[in-house]
């Protein structure tokens, strides 16, 4: 088992310098700066990987980019409409570029409409720590009152 930690990239208030102190070896991250549907270039991947690897966990071991979270799936692919074939090719090229950089553990999020939904980004647990939380009732309210969806239901 490898201990990893989610890092939201260079703009994350949690810095790699601090994260490396919590007993992890791997970083779970993405290239959130790349537009959905656009290819992740080998150069961009290499640059992010080098940034992560520039931090040592100890004298002989560096942090590593262990997991991609997430390589976004464009909505045209999800709906099989529009330029979905183009976006599939871009996605495949991104996978190849990740593999060329020896990053092979790739998560994706196939949520329709909104790619990444959490209803509370600072939910306090009983021990005082914070976690991300999903509340389906809040999502239904969002669908009904913000998106004005006719299909929102409590499942």
Protein language model features and the residues they cover:
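Short, acidic/polar
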Residues: 9-21, 48, 86-97
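Hydrophobic faces of well-ordered beta-strands that scaffold small-molecule active sites
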Residues: 3-6, 25-29, 63-69, 98, ...
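Alpha-helix-loop-beta-strand connector modules within alpha/beta enzyme cores
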Residues: 46-68, 91, 129-134
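Glycine-rich, proline-tolerant flexible connector loops at the mouths of alpha/beta enzymes
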Residues: 30-47
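Mobile, glycine- and charge-enriched loop segments
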Residues: 1-9, 49-50, 73-75, 79-83
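Active-site beta-loop-alpha junctions enriched in small/polar residues
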Residues: 6-10, 30-34, 70-73, 110-113
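Active-site acidic/histidine proton-transfer and metal-coordination neighborhood
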Residues: 77-155
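Basic, amphipathic N-terminal segments that precede the first structured/catalytic domain
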Residues: 19-34
């Amino acid at each position: 088992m490898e201990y990893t930690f989610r890092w939201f990239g260079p703009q994350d208030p949690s810095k790699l310098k601090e994260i490396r102190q919590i007993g992890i070896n791997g970083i779970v991250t993405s290239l959130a700066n790349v537009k959905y549907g656009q290819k992740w270039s080998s150069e961009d991947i290499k640059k992010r990987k080098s940034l992560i690897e520039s931090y040592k966990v100890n004298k002989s071991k560096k942090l590593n980019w262990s997991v991609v979270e997430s390589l976004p799936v464009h909505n045209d692919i999800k709906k099989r409409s529009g330029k979905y074939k183009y976006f599939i090719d871009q996605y495949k090229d991104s996978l190849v570029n990740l593999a060329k950089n020896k990053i092979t553990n790739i998560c994706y999020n196939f949520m329709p409409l909104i790619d990444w939904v959490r209803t509370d980004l600072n939910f306090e647990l009983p021990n005082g720590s914070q976690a991300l939380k999903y509340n389906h009732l809040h999502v239904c309210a969002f669908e009904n009152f913000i998106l004005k969806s006719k299909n929102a239901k409590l499942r």
